[in-house]
């Protein structure tokens, strides 16, 4: 963004109206999405360049720029990054953005939830939630298959399919209107989410930008209305909007009807394939990425709603100093959070609780036997001499349970945790060994961590 | 079921396999830890079990300190060192909860263990004795050594990077860029970063250098997902192993597939045939010629009938593991 006025805004792609942080990234995007040969995947530099390549190398003609929105498919316009964009389109864009900023200010007060979404823009190379081809290679950062392939409104990934029925009638008539939505998925996301959230205001906002600039288009909208109308939830909204519309838009209620259309359905399929999880975790989702780039240290809080276990562990984490009895016991006894899974189209093959597979398996009764009990000597195998005598094999276990003084109930880890207090100093009167930390030992002589040496020697009845 | 380049090990453990590790200097020996409480050493070319020793609870991880010493830990909270030549056992220490990971750091010559007691303990392998206990914010699920650093993956999707030469403070506190529970972390051999996998069929490639230019390069991708009847089944990615020479890595998931990925060109190089059940652990031999694949049901869907657990040894070729020339 070294230019003066000409750009003024963040770099954006003329072909699909997406926003980018950086012109370099914009160019990479264009090369990968618009100037890439569909036959040999060679990336060219410009539209005409691509056309010439296809003609010369593959003897094929192309007449439209791939992945471009209608109206922006001109293969002959030489556009590279931000250069070559016709002035009038630049102006339109600027206007759009101005209106959008007005919108987002209004919105800011209303929309407090998720500004983040996993499908984080072109600029972010962090993560490809592509809905496609899991089996193929994975797609390089610049290609965001989920998004660009669809021009215009339908192109709005997951959240927008519902929008389509109501929107297409609008599109042909007003390509510039669409830009109000898709450009910079970020923005769009905000709108989308606010659709879900609340907003009657928002949708209006969506329509707003084109308004002033495209009065002739308005008439085009009514045709779009009927489809949305039947949708559940629309009628109420329509009315509400009709009420507020005049105040907001000084537009006929017509636009309002269309906009609400997407709202009800949007909530669910917001990110169907982009990790169904995201549908549930809209809030925390983005915060995973954002904090990573800024302050990792602050990222402990974000996953609040969906992963309560994390919250409680982060809370308790702050009080953790060293491994002590109290903490592990607390974590164990607290109920693990459950995973918020998926949508109807996907299924996470994992138990519901958010504990690791090994922890879950360890809880099975068959793995709980002959685990060390507090105060119990570590059971070695036969080579560990004397202990062999003390620790009768499996059958002896039930009896041990009865014996041991601090006999905690079967815990997750074989009761070891609950037993911890058992071998803190004082619990083992004869031996009050101070440090819970294991003193070095050379194996051989059975030296239980808790210094219960003599008992080990004496007999097994103790445990 | 397997081709001539692959065979199944004889005398496998009698229950699930938790970890497989090749000897550091030869592809001949493989150490295997199991839920049947045993740790076994196999002579791979001869396809026979050389040695076996026991814990009193399921063993969750094992590692070689050097070609003759195996370390292991598990549900019995005990960290054992076993001399493979003399068959002598040594109880080195314990944690307060099951030990989940055991790793060796050659640069600093220290063994590291991570446990569900939310600590990482370091051990001097020569004595052997405890060389410190370090609190983690959560239960430790995975550990990986990168040069002289230790990368710890815990519950709650936290990732901590410790400098093994200076354990007074955590060098980096991070959060996994994946939204689901961390399953496995393995460091790149070039020490620039690590690969992290989650239970939700996704793998992230992250860099250690915190500067923004480097952080921009990080990315994640979906994998180990199968579409059946319009429902996408998403599987945990349990295992990651790097190929020493090509810097490519293999991932194994609960879908029973093993994929080999080229992280620099961001491409998948290869996918093997489907194994009978979930892949619990993977290990490339140090010369990159052999991949040990532990196919072992991980109780993702509770205690149910499942195919037999087994360890498959596969001779891998360059075609499967070597990056193709980079595209533009």
Swiss-Prot record, chain B:
SMART domains assigned to the protein according to its UniProt record, in alphabetical order: WD40
Name assigned to this protein: Mitotic checkpoint protein BUB3
Family: Belongs to the WD repeat BUB3 family.
WD-type repeats, residues: 5-43, 46-83, 86-124, 128-163, 223-262
Localization: Nucleus; Chromosome, Centromere, Kinetochore
The species this protein was found in: Pongo abelii (Sumatran orangutan)
GO biological process terms held by the UniProt record: cell division; chromosome segregation; meiotic cell cycle; regulation of chromosome segregation
Covalent link Glycyl lysine isopeptide (Lys-Gly) (interchain with G-Cter in ubiquitin), residues: 216
Sequence positions bearing N6-acetyllysine: 179
Entry coiled-coil feature ranges: none
């Amino acid at each position: 963004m070294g230019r003066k006025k000409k750009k003024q805004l963040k770099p954006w792609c003329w072909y699909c109206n997406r926003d980018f942080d950086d012109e370099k990234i914009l160019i990479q995007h264009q090369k990968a999405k618009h100037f890439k040969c569909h036959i040999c995947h060679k990336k060219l530099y410009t539209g005409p360049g691509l056309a010439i390549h296809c003609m010369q190398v593959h003897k094929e003609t192309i007449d439209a720029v791939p992945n471009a929105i209608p109206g922006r498919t001109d293969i002959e316009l030489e556009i590279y990054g931000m250069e070559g964009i016709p002035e009038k389109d630049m102006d339109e864009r600027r206007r759009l953005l101005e209106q959008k900023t007005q919108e987002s200010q209004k919105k800011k007060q209303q929309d407090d939830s998720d500004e983040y979404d996993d499908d984080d823009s072109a600029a972010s190379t962090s993560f490809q939630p592509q809905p496609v081809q899991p089996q193929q290679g994975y797609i390089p950062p610049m290609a965001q298959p989920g998004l660009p392939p669809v021009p215009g409104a339908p192109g709005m990934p997951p959240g927008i399919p519902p929008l389509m029925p109501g929107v297409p009638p609008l599109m042909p008539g007003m390509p510039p209107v669409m830009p109000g939505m898709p450009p910079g998925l970020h923005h769009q996301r905000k709108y989308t989410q606010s659709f879900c959230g609340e907003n009657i205001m928002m949708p209006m906002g969506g329509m707003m930008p084109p308004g002033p600039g495209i009065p002739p288009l308005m008439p085009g909208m009514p045709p779009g209305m009927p489809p949305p109308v039947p949708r559940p939830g629309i009628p109420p909204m329509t009315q509400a909007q009709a009420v507020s519309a005049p105040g907001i838009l000084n537009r006929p209620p017509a636009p309002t009807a269309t906009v609400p259309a997407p709202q009800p359905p949007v909530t669910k399929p917001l990110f169907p394939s982009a990790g169904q999880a995201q549908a549930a975790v809209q809030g925390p989702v983005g915060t995973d990425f954002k904090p990573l780039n800024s302050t990792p240290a602050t990222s402990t809080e974000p996953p609040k709603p969906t992963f309560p276990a994390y919250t409680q562990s982060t809370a308790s984490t702050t009080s953790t100093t060293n491994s002590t009895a109290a903490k592990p016991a607390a974590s164990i006894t607290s109920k693990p959070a459950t995973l918020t899974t998926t949508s109807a189209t996907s299924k996470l093959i994992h138990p519901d609780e958010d504990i690791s597979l090994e922890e879950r398996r360890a809880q099975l009764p068959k793995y709980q036997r002959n685990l060390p009990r507090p105060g119990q000597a570590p059971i070695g195998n036969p080579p560990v001499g004397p202990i062999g005598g003390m620790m009768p094999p499996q059958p002896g276990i039930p009896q041990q349970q009865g014996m041991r003084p601090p006999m905690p109930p079967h815990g997750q880890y074989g009761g070891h945790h609950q037993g911890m207090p058992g071998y803190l100093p004082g619990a083992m009167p004869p031996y009050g060994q101070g440090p819970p930390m294991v003193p070095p030992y050379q194996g051989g002589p059975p030296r239980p961590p808790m210094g219960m040496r003599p008992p080990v020697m004496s007999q097994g009845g103790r445990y | 079921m397997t081709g001539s380049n692959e065979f199944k090990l004889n005398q496998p453990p009698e229950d699930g396999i938790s970890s497989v590790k090749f000897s550091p200097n030869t592809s001949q020996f493989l150490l295997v830890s199991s839920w049947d409480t045993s740790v076994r050493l196999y002579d791979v070319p001869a396809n026979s079990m050389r040695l076996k020793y026991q814990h009193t609870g399921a063993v969750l991880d094992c590692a070689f300190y050097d070609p003759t010493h195996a370390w292991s830990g598990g549900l019995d909270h005990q960290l054992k060192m076993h001399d493979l030549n003399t068959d002598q056992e040594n109880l080195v220490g314990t944690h307060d909860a099951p030990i989940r990971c055991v790793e060796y750091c050659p640069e600093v010559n220290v063994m590291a263990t991570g446990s569900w007691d939310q600590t990482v303990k370091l051990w001097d392998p020569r004595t052997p004795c405890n060389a410190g206990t370090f609190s983690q914010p959560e239960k430790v699920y995975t550990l990986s050594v990168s040069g002289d650093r230790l990368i710890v993956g815990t519950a709650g999707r936290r990732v901590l990077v410790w400098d093994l030469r200076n354990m007074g403070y955590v060098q980096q506190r991070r959060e996994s860029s994946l939204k689901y529970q961390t399953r496995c972390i393995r460091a790149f051999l070039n020490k620039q970063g690590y690969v992290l996998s989650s239970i939700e069929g996704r793998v992230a490639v992250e860099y250690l250098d915190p500067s923004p230019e480097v952080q921009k390069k990080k990315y994640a991708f979906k994998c180990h997902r199968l579409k059946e009847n319009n429902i996408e089944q998403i599987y945990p990615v349990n295992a990651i192993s790097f190929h020493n020479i090509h810097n490519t890595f293999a991932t194994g998931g609960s879908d029973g597939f093993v994929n080999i990925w080229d992280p620099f060109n961001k491409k998948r190089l290869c996918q093997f045939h489907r194994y009978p059940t979930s892949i619990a652990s993977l290990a490339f031999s140090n010369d990159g010629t052999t991949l040990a694949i532990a196919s072992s049901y991980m109780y993702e869907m509770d205690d149910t009938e499942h195919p037999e657990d087994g360890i498959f040894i596969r001779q891998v070729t360059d075609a499967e593991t070597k990056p193709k020339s980079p595209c533009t």
